[in-house]
UniProtKB/Swiss-Prot annotation:
Result for mutant: C252S: Strongly reduces palmitoylation and its ability to regulate GPCR signaling. Abolishes palmitoylation and its ability to regulate GPCR signaling
Superkingdom of this protein's organism: Eukaryota
Compositional bias segments (type: Basic and acidic residues): 32-45
Effect of R246E: Abolishes nuclear localization
Posttranslational mods: Palmitoylated. Undergoes rapid palmitoylation turnover. De novo and turnover palmitoylation are both mediated by ZDHHC2. Palmitoylation regulates the cell membrane and nuclear shuttling and the regulation of GPCR signaling. Upon depalmitoylation, it is targeted from the plasma membrane into the nucleus. GPCR signaling inhibits depalmitoylation and promotes localization to the plasma membrane.
Keywords for this protein: Cell membrane, Cytoplasm, Lipoprotein, Membrane, Nucleus, Palmitate, Signal transduction inhibitor
Official protein name in the record: Regulator of G-protein signaling 7-binding protein
Motif (Nuclear localization signal): 242-247
Effect of C253S: Strongly reduces palmitoylation and its ability to regulate GPCR signaling. Abolishes palmitoylation and its ability to regulate GPCR signaling
Length: 257
């Protein structure tokens, strides 16, 4: 290496230094790309699961509203009781299945109980809880109505007595749908047995939905457990703060036209 006139050694040029001390970034390994891809894929899966859960809760809300309309129709003289009870059983069974699926999906995407939670998940928890509470209430109403009409029928059969045709026609016109005119005592006994079976099935489904409601409350995230009823539906992003209650915060169990 040549020396400068003043005795100092000549430093390498800038280009030489850059070539000597050049530091290149190592290429991304396959694992880095996989981690980046898996992060976006995980977020996409979470959003898709959230959308599926939201749709399930909305469908369950509709089923509860339909079941409520059927319960109101019990005893209506314009409705055939056997067909009404069959439709109630179909709607109730479908609603119970939707409630179970919604609870499973919601529990899967909620994450740790004491961790950060998306406000949309909080709303789904509250909506599902409200629907389940209304669902069990309507089941109890149907049990009471069917039981009272069944008791009314048995009381009239026990009283007995011959009736003329005119009085029977007048009675049938004022009788609730559960008391359809029967041609024989055997059919009457079969009808009573079917109603009793429907009541037992409804009681079983009601117990199952109450247990599901208890599980939902147990697995509910801590931010929701710490909120009072007045602020449950006025949720803000985590951490939650209390807000003024809005006038219209949403409706539960309405059939959309």
């Amino acid at each position: 290496m040549s020396s400068a006139p003043n005795g100092r050694k000549k430093r390498p040029s800038r280009s030489t230094r850059s070539s000597i001390f050049q530091i290149s970034k190592p290429p991304l390994q396959s694992g880095d790309w996989e981690r980046r891809g898996s992060g976006s894929e995980s977020a996409h899966k979470t959003q898709r699961a959230l959308d599926d859960c939201k749709m399930l809760v909305q469908e369950f809300n509709t089923q509860v509203a339909l079941y409520r309309e059927l319960v109101i129709s019990i005893g209506d003289v314009s409705v055939s009781c056997p067909s009404l009870r069959a439709e109630m059983h179909k709607t109730r069974t479908k609603g119970c299945e939707m409630a179970r699926q919604a609870h499973q999906k919601l529990a899967a995407i909620s994450g740790p109980e004491d961790g950060e939670i998306h406000p949309e998940i909080c709303r789904l928890y509250i909506q599902l809880q409200c629907c389940l509470e209304m669902y069990t209430t309507e089941m109890l109403k149907s049990i009471c109505l069917l039981g009272s009409l069944q008791f009314h029928r048995k009381g009239k059969e026990a009283s007995g007595g011959a009736k003329n045709l005119d009085s029977k026609i007048e009675e049938n016109a004022e009788t609730p749908a559960l008391e359809d005119s029967l041609s024989s005592p055997l059919e009457s006994q079969q009808q009573c047995w079917q109603v009793a079976t429907d009541i037992e099935n409804t009681e079983r489904d009601m117990r199952e939905m109450k247990n599901l409601l208890s599980k939902l409350r147990e697995t509910m995230p801590l931010p929701l457990k710490n909120q009072d009823d007045s602020s449950l539906l006025n949720l803000t992003p985590y951490p939650m703060v209390r807000r003024r209650k809005r006038r219209f915060f949403g409706l539960c169990c309405l059939v959309s036209s």
